[in-house]
Structures are given as C-alpha cells and as structure tokens.
C-alpha cells in the first residue's frame, strides 16, 4: 500500500468534477501539502477542500497545460518554493472537443507529457529528488477505441503508451519515480456535457450517451485515490461502475522482449541473436 500520509501532492487539472472529488478524498488522507494548478480560479472549491483538513497546506496557481515547456518551468520553479518537493504528481487535465483536434491533443496528451518532462527533474533521485509517483488520469477509451470520440480516444491511447513507456525499469531503477494510469469509465461530469462526435454519423450515439447510466463523480474520485494507494509501477487501472480493476497488460509485438534485451545488452551474442531473429 502506498501511504499518502504526509505526502506533498501536485494536481494539474481543473478543480471541478473528477479533480475536485479526488482532491476531497486526498484531503482525508492526511497529506501535508496540496498544490493545484488549473486554468481558472475556483475559490469556493479551494475553501471546500481546506474545510476538510485545516492542517493541510493548499496552494493554487492559474495554469494552462498547453503552454510551452519553457513557460511551465517558470511555474514549477515557483511551485517548488512552496512545496519543497513533490511526492505525487497527478495529471488530470482533459478536453473532449472533436471539433478542435489540436486543442484536444494538446490538452490531453502533449500538455501532460510536457508537464511530466518539466516535473521529473525535481523528483528524480539522481538529480537530488526523492523519487515518487506520477498518476495519469485518463479514460477507458484509451484502452478500447471509440467510434464517436475519435480524437479524444487517440489522445487517451497516447497517454497509456506514454505511461507504459515511462514506467519501464530502464527509467524507474534510475530515477525512483513510479508511473501509473487510471482509466475512468463514463462519469456524470463528462456525460452531462454537450458532446459532439468526430463525424456526423456518430452524433446520435453522442446524444444518447447523455442518457446512459454512468458512475458518480464522487465514486470515481474515491477510486482514483484507491488506485494510488494500491499502486505499482506501470500499473493501469479501470475505475468504472463504482469499482476498480487492474488491467492485464500484453505485448503484441512478438519481438518486444528480444528488442528490449538487445537495447539493454552489451553482450555481442545477445545482439547477434536479436538480429538473427529478424
């Protein structure tokens, strides 16, 4: 179990919906500090969080996840002055706008990757950090395709690929930073929005989704924290229908293991074996 007591948590997401409900649960776990970076100010939400645990220090920054990495660095330099260090980074910024592919990809994938690249040096054990945990909050349609939300699904598939790649022992054994993802199923805060399909053929399905059964935002937030507490490096979770399920990961490329061994090996025989198999 990952013990959140005394931890310094940084949450990059709008403090509403899933992020707010997740933060509420985090505040019951005796964390020491919570930094919230979001696109708009939400003083009532911050006050609500503070009322749960007065001793937890909460810091807030207005933050655009799509900004350039150089600009992000300036923000996180300020964050570190207040936080001292980051134990847990949660990436939860999300956008589903099939009419604006660039914004969807930049928010869900590019922005998340830039955030991780910016924060990792502060956490990296070999760079003076203490290691820690990165949590990427994503969607079940990052595991299975969506014929309705094609751009959104593509961005979420990217999150899973990035998470699994960064969790490789090649990195984890060096920097001490575990990486995991939580894939949320249909959640009330999402389906209550006006949703537009990638192509007009799918719009009737998008409209129908608003009437479909879904999990409450509060339950989803609770299960995100449950996943964090049960986390292992590289683990992917599904938080759906009020439950939490670990995903069985597979290698589909038949040469994957040999390729990794080839890349990591200094033994000429291992390298010759891989090249011979091709």
Curated annotation (Swiss-Prot):
Keyword entries, A-Z: Oxidoreductase
Organism domain of life: Eukaryota
A cellular-component GO term for this protein: cytoplasm
Residues that coordinate or bind substrate: 139
Binding site for NAD(+): 11-34
Coiled-coil regions listed in the entry: none
Active site: 152 (proton acceptor)
GO molecular function: oxidoreductase activity
InterPro entries: ADH-rel, NAD(P)-bd_dom_sf, Sc_DH/Rdtase_CS, SDR_fam
Family: Belongs to the short-chain dehydrogenases/reductases (SDR) family.
Stated name of the protein: Alcohol dehydrogenase-related 31 kDa protein
Organism expressing this protein natively: Drosophila pseudoobscura pseudoobscura
Originating gene: Adhr
């Amino acid at each position: 179990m990952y013990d959140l007591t005394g931890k310094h948590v940084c949450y990059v997401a709008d403090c509403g919906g899933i992020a707010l409900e997740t933060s509420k649960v985090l505040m019951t776990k005796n964390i020491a500090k919570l930094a919230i970076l979001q696109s708009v100010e939400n003083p009532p939400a911050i006050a609500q969080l503070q009322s749960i645990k007065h001793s937890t220090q909460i810091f807030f920054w207005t933050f655009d996840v799509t900004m350039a990495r150089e600009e992000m660095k300036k923000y996180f330099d300020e964050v570190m002055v207040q936080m001292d260090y980051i134990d847990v980074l949660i990436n939860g910024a999300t956008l589903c706008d099939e009419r604006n592919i660039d914004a969807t990809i930049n928010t869900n994938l590019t922005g998340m990757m830039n955030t991780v690249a910016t924060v990792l040096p502060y956490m990296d054990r070999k760079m003076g950090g203490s290691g820690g945990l990165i949590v990427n909050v994503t969607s079940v349609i990052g595991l299975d395709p969506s014929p309705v939300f094609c751009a959104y699904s593509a961005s979420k598939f990217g999150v899973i690929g990035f998470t699994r790649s960064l969790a490789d022992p090649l990195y984890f054994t060096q920097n001490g930073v575990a990486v995991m993802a939580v894939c949320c199923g249909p959640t009330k805060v999402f389906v209550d929005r006006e949703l537009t399909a990638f192509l007009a053929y799918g719009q009737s399905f998008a409209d129908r989704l608003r009437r479909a059964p879904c999990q409450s935002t509060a339950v989803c937030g609770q299960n995100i924290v449950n996943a964090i507490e049960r986390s292992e490096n590289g683990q992917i979770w599904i938080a759906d229908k009020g439950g939490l399920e670990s995903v069985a990961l597979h290698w589909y490329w038949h040469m994957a293991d040999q390729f990794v061994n080839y890349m990591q090996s200094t033994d000429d025989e291992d390298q010759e074996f891989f090249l011979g198999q091709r």
